[in-house]
Amino acid sequence: MLYLFRKLADIVIKRPIVVLVIILSISAILAGFATQSVSVQDVVTGDNELTQALEVIDDVFGEPTSVLQVVLESDKDIRSADALSALNSIEGAIHQSELSGTLVTDSQQPAIVSFLSGVEQAAQEAGIDPNYLDDDMVVALRQQSLEMLPPQFADLFESLLGSGSPPTTGLMLVFQNTTGLNSIQVTDQQRELADVISAVDITQDLTVTPFGFGLLLTANDPGPEIGRLFGIALVIILIILAVVYWFKPQAGQRRMIFRRTAADVVMTLAVIIMAVIWMQGIGVLLGPEYLNIIGHFSPQTQIVPILIVGLGVDFAIHLFSRYRFELGSSGDPEKALRISMTTTGLTLMLATGATAIGFLTNLFSPVSFLATLGVLAAVGITAAFLLTVTFLPAIRLILDRRAARKGGLPLKALASQTEGGLSRIVERTAWLAERVPVVTIVIALLLTVLGGYGFTQLDNEFNLTDFVPKNEPLLLTYDTIVEKFEGGFEERTQVLITGEAISPQIHNTLINQIAKVKEIPGVQSFGEFADANSIVSVLGQAFSTDLAFELASLGITADLRVSDDTDVEALYSLLIIKVPGADQVIARSDNDDLITRVDIRTSAGQDGAATLAANLNEIFAPLEETGMKVVATSRLIAQARQSEAIEDSQVLSLLIALAGAMSLLVIYFTINVRRPLIGILTVLPVGLVLALTFGTMAITGIPINPVTATLAALSIGIGVPFTIHFTSRFLEERVKENDCGSALRRTVSQTGSALTGSALTTAIGFGVLITSSLIVFQQLGYVIVYAITYSLMASILVLPSMLALWDSWDRRHHESPS
């Protein structure tokens, strides 16, 4: 490996222009592919029985209707004449618009209903002109109309009035025909209808907000938010880089130092930009349009450029820091570059490998976009490394050769750069390793145990609304629907039932279990029954038609059960042919297997989704005893399952990441210095980083979610490079120094100060995420700052103590420290 870096250094030294041309050509080619990237919303995906059931339901039954919930809010009782007038205006605008043709026309389902439906009819029956109603009359007539309805219908209309005394919110439901439309087209159709409703002139005393969950998730493109965060992070990091790269000039050299600092900052910026371009281009090549190895880019994977900014800048800092030190010592740019490439360059390769391993553990994540994110991050960090060891040294060498010919190299200033205040402050931490290494390690172990306990206390959450900006108005509307209307009318839970054949026993068991669904918490009722579409509702509709006699002849009784000799196959075929809507609950697969579903209106929400699924599966368990397969599923249930899967995969991801990084380092240090134990010691402090980060997350209330679930990868990606840099430099210094203390002090002074500068840069850069309007990115910002802080502490406080004890043991067992 050292031979390869020597050859690479030779190429850069002999042909820097050629290196630059090759790098810029590759960047131009990949930039062409980068422009082809497509961003696709991808959050709740995965390959499990829940998502597979949702796909079957979508393919076989589809969703023939969608409901747009229109929330009316007022500072006073919403049962008012103004609200009635507003509802009439909205309904009139809908019927007069081009979207009137999208309204459902089913006689069993009115296209538009509201909390004041029936008021005008009650007024007309009472001989009152609806145009002259006052608020009190509206309240009275509404109550009168409800009393005229069957109890189940009265309960339904009552649920359209928000809770509170007096109620200040009410709902209008607009049902649209969505046959043949996919989810994107359904949302687009709802958005057009929402625009029509929003354009209606309503009295200022009322607020009218059309709402659909699809509208909420697509209301804001996260792209501009990511772009803003990327831009801010870049600007802040560049400013800090200027401070980090600046060093005290000698007399008359201020302008020279300024130009050099500015050039280093610009070169680092170029590396970051090209690394992002390479990541985007290679991501397209690996994506569905070409190699189909990873998924599409998504709004969530667009956070990768910010990761590249934070982690990629670290490479430039370390390479420039070592190069400046060697240049100041030797005065020869070529010699300084060769030493830097074969020492720091090799260390950067190890850090890149460990970081890539950490991110690639996301391939084991049950959330598909995390797998894509992991691959993209690994590609981006690898690109940053390649550019750092080719583009940066090539252009720096060209500039320094030119400066050397003109006598413009600030050698004395470069030689004195490690004597700064930061180096002296950091050097003092070596006292712990020299005087109390055992105490330091014991304290670290205790903190690791405490952090591990914090890990057991972490919550797991997977809410799609976390991907919606906090200032999005529709998010407030969503909260209103959850609070005032028990989640509203969009939440549906499906029970998919499949099997090879249907028998009287299976049919009767299905009827029996459907009757019990109403007892489950979170299931909305319609009179005495659960508000659900199922074989029960289809049979009830059939009995109200002229099919009643034919059904009776087939063996259907009044309680919808069948006799033992009933031909249930023929019964279901008759229902599909003769009863409108029966094909929405009964179907046949391509293999002629039975597929039926129970489509239930629920209000369990995210928190109750898992419990609801468990209760439904328990209710329908007797069907499985008859040979049928039962799966209770919904978008919320799938999210809950994903949350559990993320938690379960955390330990596996951690073990894989740590084992991979440790194996890499053990192999390297075995080959390079014949000290495999060093590889293990270098990774061990990362365990402290993980434990403390998890513990701090528990203290600050940050849960495990699809974004913070990248913590294993991030901690490996941030922590291992820190410890690798320190260990590698220590091994160099212990060869030069006979005294372990001197080697530690020099390592802490030189590498420790670079690590501190790098940590400061990346922490502030990633800290920009804390300003995001997206909760998950805010949380990720905090988590990364935690990980960076603890990685720095572990590398300059804990690792030196471990190396001090190892050095003492190693010198007793080996004649040479090399």
Can you say where each PLM-predicted feature lies in the sequence?
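Feature of extramembrane
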Residues: 1-262, 402-655, 808-818
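Membrane-embedded transmembrane helical bundles of large multi-pass transporters/channels
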Residues: 1-42, 178-460, 604, 614, ...
